[in-house]
Amino acid sequence: MLEGLVGLLLQAEISKAQIEVQDSVDSYYVAKADSATGHVIEVTYDVNSRGEIAGDLEEFRNVVAETLSDSRGWVRANVKFTEVESGGRLHMVLAAPAEVAAASSGCSDKLSCTVKPYVYINDDRWLGGSDSYNELGVTLQNYRRMVINHEVGHFLGHGHVTECETSTGLAPIMLQQSTGLLGCKPNSWPLPNELWVKGI
C-alpha cells in the first residue's frame, strides 16, 4: 500500500518536471520537457535541392518533416512548422558542398550553414555524418536530426554556444557538434534553456 502511494507520488512529480530520458534505440540521452503552452509561432517552409546532390530529396523532405514536428524539438518553444510547396518563410535546402560554400563568406563546403531564410544542409554531411558522431557510434539518423535542429535554431535567432549543459553534460543543440563535442554528450534536440525564439 505504502509502496503504491510512493510510486504514484513519484509519477506525479516526474510528470511535472523537465527530465532527461534515455533513447534506448540509440543509447544516448536526449532532453525532454513538458509540452509548451502559450502563443504559437507558425513557420511555413519549403524543401528544395541546390547543385548536384547524391542524397535523396524525398528522404530529406521526410526527415525534415519528422524532425520539425517531433515533440522533443522546437515545437516545445511553441513553433509550428508547416510544409508548403513554395514561398515558405523558411527554405530547407539539401545542397552540394560547393553550393553551401557559395551561399555566404561565412559558410564552408565542409559543413551545413544557415543564411536566413535559407537553411543549407550539406549533402556530404547528410550522407556521411561527422567524425564527432561517427566515432561514438551515434546513428546517422540522429546526426541528421541534430544538424536540422541546429541550423533551424539559427533561423529562430540562436547563435553558437560552447559549454555543456551543467547537470547532464549534454551538448546544447546550438553547440557545433559537427566539428567536435568539447567533452559533451551528443544530443539531437534543443535543451530546455534553448526554448526561445527571436527575430522571426
What are these regions (language model features)?
Residues 15, 39-41, 86, 113-115, ...:
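A short, polar/charged loop/turn motif at coil->beta-strand junctions and beta-hairpin connectors
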Residues 44-46, 91-93, 119-122, 155, ...:
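Structural recognition of the beta-strand scaffold that forms the well-ordered cores
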Residues 51-54, 74, 97-101, 125-128, ...:
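Solvent-exposed loop/turn segments at secondary-structure junctions
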Residues 5-53:
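Disordered inhibitory propeptide/activation segment of secreted metzincin zinc metalloprotease zymogens
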Residues 141-160:
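Active-site recognition of the HExxH zinc-binding catalytic motif
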Residues 2, 108-111, 115, 119-123, ...:
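Metalloprotease/metallohydrolase-associated module, dominated by Zn2+-dependent proteases
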Residues 58-145:
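Metzincin-family zinc-dependent endopeptidase catalytic domain
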Residues 135-136, 150, 154, 166:
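Compact recognition or signaling/catalytic modules
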